[in-house]
């Protein structure tokens, strides 16, 4: 008797697979559930993410690997490898091996990189023969969380349509059975990470070096350990490293891009020119200037965009950012003759808008920066090297560049923990919260902004208020947080 999985494999192997045809095969082969999935969508703004042992498990990773393999093969129409990497979390080995088992059960070859940044997976996927890439990481989340990010053959985040196909297969929960003739193989390809490191330095070869610069790097006990310090040193910088070891118990704990305090102190203590803080998978970065002042993604986009504009290299003087971008950034960029397009929060939305509009530069306030000249995913190391080179070429300090850029509107962001997933994702149905938002928007008019949204990566509702002064921002933030806590997080 031919198993359901074998029938699906044969359908894809035959080379006649189409999206509609695959859906028909999936629907005709559904079986009783083997894993428990939430009623709400599994994919968030940055892949699949959750607490290990609750949402994420080895059986789920196995299923995700298999269905990702089936969908990727159905759209590629041929057998090519999948590139797989991971961060330093204790659970990453388990999830990576389970996911690799699923991919090989789908008949695909796996090239395993081991510990590496997320943009390393994206880059190697885009320049190799790979059919796609997968990264095991929960980015800036705490050690007990983990996640699965899937990339297409171009190195960009997988489209929502393909994510939906994978989730459709997952919700069928077919038992995974395979046979020797259909299995793929798992190969260790750790040497490829060096190719990514060389690619990072390539834009500045024989043009710019960082000699004479002192740089502090906070590696957050994560995926950039070792690699980032070596790349900066090879570019000529004097490097001081913080949290530069792979530590699954401490990744992101009071360090990295969400906790700049130690980096700020170290930059001032060592009289460094600038500092960079990466998150756990190094797809984002925030900077610190010589005075210890934080430099977020808005400033990085402005400085990088202005440099490109002055070189006549920025198409339509366009930058893509999100609804979180500060009004001060937007107004200053407009005064420079530039245009800013806002998207929903999430680099996948920034990526989609960049593709749609032909924009070269985009990103998020949180430090995800995308430049289509180099690829279509956020790259913390590449962004850090660009900012450092801009400072070196300018002949002035990062502090002076920031002083000359723009003044931000006071902006407060508060996170309210809402454990109930359904209540969190459907918060818009809460009338008291909507009424409070309407009242605040009416009171501030066009001198402020309010953004309330469910996080796509954490069990929280984010409340952001931007106002003409700090007192107004603080007042309305407190009012809205109180309503969310009372009605959504009792």
From Swiss-Prot:
Any GO CC annotation of this UniProt entry: cytosol
Cofactor(s) the record lists: Mg(2+)
Any one GO molecular function term: phosphoglucosamine mutase activity
Residues found modified as Phosphoserine: 139
Chemical reaction(s) catalysed: alpha-D-glucosamine 1-phosphate = D-glucosamine 6-phosphate
Keyword Magnesium: yes
UniProt-listed Pfam families: PGM_PMM_I, PGM_PMM_II, PGM_PMM_III, PGM_PMM_IV
Taxonomy, superkingdom: Bacteria
UniProt KW keywords: Isomerase, Magnesium, Metal-binding, Phosphoprotein
SUPFAM superfamilies: Phosphoglucomutase, C-terminal domain, Phosphoglucomutase, first 3 domains
Disulfide pairings: none
Major enzyme class: isomerase
Co-factor binding comment: Binds 1 Mg(2+) ion per subunit.
Family, per entry: Belongs to the phosphohexose mutase family.
Functional description taken from the UniProt entry: Catalyzes the conversion of glucosamine-6-phosphate to glucosamine-1-phosphate.
UniProt-recorded name of the protein: Phosphoglucosamine mutase
Organism: Trichormus variabilis (strain ATCC 29413 / PCC 7937)
């Amino acid at each position: 008797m031919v198993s359901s999985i074998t029938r699906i494999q044969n359908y894809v192997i035959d080379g006649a697979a189409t999206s509609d045809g695959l859906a028909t095969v999936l629907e005709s082969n559904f079986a009783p559930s083997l894993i428990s999935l939430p009623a709400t969508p599994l994919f968030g703004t940055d892949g699949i993410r959750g607490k290990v042992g609750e949402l994420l498990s080895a059986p789920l990773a196995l299923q995700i690997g298999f269905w990702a393999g089936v969908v990727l093969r159905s759209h590629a129409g041929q057998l090519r490898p999948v590139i797989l990497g991971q961060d330093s979390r204790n659970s990453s080995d388990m999830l990576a091996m389970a996911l690799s088992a699923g991919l090989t059960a789908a008949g695909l070859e796996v090239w395993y990189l081991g510990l590496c940044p997320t943009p390393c997976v994206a880059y190697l996927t885009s320049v190799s023969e790979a059919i796609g890439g997968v990264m095991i990481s929960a980015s800036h989340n705490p050690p007990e969380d983990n996640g699965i990010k899937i990339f297409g053959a171009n190195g960009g985040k997988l489209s929502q349509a393909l994510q939906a196909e994978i989730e459709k297969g997952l919700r069928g929960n077919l038992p995974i059975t395979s046979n020797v003739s259909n299995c793929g193989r798992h190969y260790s390809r750790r040497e490829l990470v060096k190719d990514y490191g060389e690619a990072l330095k390539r834009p500045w070869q024989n043009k710019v070096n960082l000699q004479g610069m002192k740089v502090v790097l906070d590696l957050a006990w994560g995926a950039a350990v070792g690699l980032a310090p070596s790349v900066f040193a090879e570019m000529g910088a004097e490097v001081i490293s913080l949290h530069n070891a792979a530590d699954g118990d401490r990744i992101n704990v009071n360090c990295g891009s969400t906790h700049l305090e130690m980096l700020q102190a170290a930059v001032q203590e060592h009289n460094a020119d600038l500092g960079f803080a990466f998150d756990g998978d190094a797809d984002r970065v925030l900077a610190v200037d010589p005075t210890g002042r934080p430099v977020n993604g808005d400033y990085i986009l402005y400085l990088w965009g202005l440099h490109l504009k002055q070189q006549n290299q920025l198409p339509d003087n366009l930058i893509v950012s999100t609804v979180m971008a500060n009004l001060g950034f937007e107004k200053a960029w407009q005064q420079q003759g530039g245009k800013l397009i806002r998207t929903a929060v999430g680099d996948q939305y920034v990526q989609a808008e960049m593709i749609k509009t032909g924009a070269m530069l985009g990103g998020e306030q949180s430090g995800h920066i995308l430049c289509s000249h180099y690829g279509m995913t956020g790259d913390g190391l590449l962004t850090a090297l660009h900012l450092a080179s801009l400072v070196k070429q300018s002949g002035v300090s990062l502090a002076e560049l920031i002083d000359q850029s723009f003044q931000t509107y006071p902006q407060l962001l508060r996170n309210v923990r809402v454990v109930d997933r359904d209540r969190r994702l459907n918060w818009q149905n809460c009338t008291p919260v909507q009424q409070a938002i309407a009242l605040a928007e009416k009171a501030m008019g066009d001198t402020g902004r309010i953004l309330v949204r469910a996080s796509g990566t954490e069990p929280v509702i984010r409340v952001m208020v931007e106002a003409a002064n700090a007192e107004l921002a603080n007042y309305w933030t407190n009012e809205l947080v109180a309503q969310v806590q009372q009605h959504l997080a009792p």
